[in-house]
Amino acid sequence: MANNMLHRYLFKDLSVRGELVQLDDTYQQMISSQEYPAAVQHLIGELLVATSLLTATLKFEGSITLQLQGNGPVSLVVINGDNNQQVRGVARWKGDIADDASLHDMLGKGHLVITIEPKQGERYQGVVGLEGDTLAQVLEGYFERSEQLKTRLWIRVGKHDGKACAAGMLLQIVPDGKGSAEDFEHLEQLTNTIKDEELFALPAEELLYRLYNQETVQLFTPQQISFRCGCSRERSAAAIVTVAREEINDILAQDGAVALHCDYCGTTYSFDSAQVAELYAPSSANGSTLH
């Protein structure tokens, strides 16, 4: 398996473009930060694959956030990815969740929020109802209504060689007016034959050849996908000094230290009374080192 890679490809004669995402370590890092139930791990994997596929459509510097919200036992699953394919994610749940729980079992009545944030330009946000049995179907409906581009997604989460992995494919008509519905349906039928093990394990070139060996496929340079939460001790320190000193002193008196926990990666940053005093000292504003 080409670990943690995004591959873009184009059917030049058919005006259809495609994407392939294969993840192992990046997905494993994301689900290891908390003791997620198996079904929640699966949903995180699906949303992670979907986010990487959608982030690949960005034609500018920026990020996409996919956020599932609901009134069920899983209240939130959120994945953020940027144009450099740096991703992070977290989920909120309560109670016991069956291993075979479906999307609707977990979220109940809910929706998907898609937020696109360019570094320059206006922020866009769309809200999509959970229409369909799977996340892939929900997103296909979104593309049909908002982009008016025929789009299909295949998203799989499972294990390969005993390790968690997630993968997916996307097909979309290129908006040049040349792609036909018949050509797209032909490629859909070919892609429907993909097996989980092939999607998890085969190199991109071999996988695409198995599926589309009668077609002319242009495969572009792949892009690495990496887990990056963005937390640091410095950022935690900066957050502490935004809180009133009296409130921080109360925490120190009660707990002996101020601790900030990153839900994305599971790291806890702890500051004792001496370190807190250093943060509030005038010299800290001039770039003193945090230990």
UniProtKB/Swiss-Prot annotation:
Keyword hit for Signal: no
GO BP of this protein: protein refolding
Modification after translation (UniProt): Under oxidizing conditions two disulfide bonds are formed involving the reactive cysteines. Under reducing conditions zinc is bound to the reactive cysteines and the protein is inactive.
Gene Ontology CC terms, in alphabetical order: cytoplasm
InterPro entries in the record: Heat_shock_Hsp33, Heat_shock_Hsp33_C, Heat_shock_Hsp33_N, Hsp33_helix_hairpin_bin_dom_sf
Keywords: Chaperone, Cytoplasm, Disulfide bond, Redox-active center, Zinc
Gene3D superfamilies: helix hairpin bin, Hsp33 domain, HSP33 redox switch-like
Keyword Zinc: yes
Subcellular location: Cytoplasm
Disulfide bonds: 229-231, 262-265
Molecular function (Gene Ontology), one example: unfolded protein binding
Family from the record: Belongs to the HSP33 family.
Function: Redox regulated molecular chaperone. Protects both thermally unfolding and oxidatively damaged proteins from irreversible aggregation. Plays an important role in the bacterial defense system toward oxidative stress.
HAMAP family from the UniProt entry: HslO
Protein name in the entry: 33 kDa chaperonin
Organism per entry: Vibrio cholerae serotype O1 (strain ATCC 39315 / El Tor Inaba N16961)
Classification of source organism: Bacteria, Pseudomonadati, Pseudomonadota, Gammaproteobacteria, Vibrionales
Gene: hslO
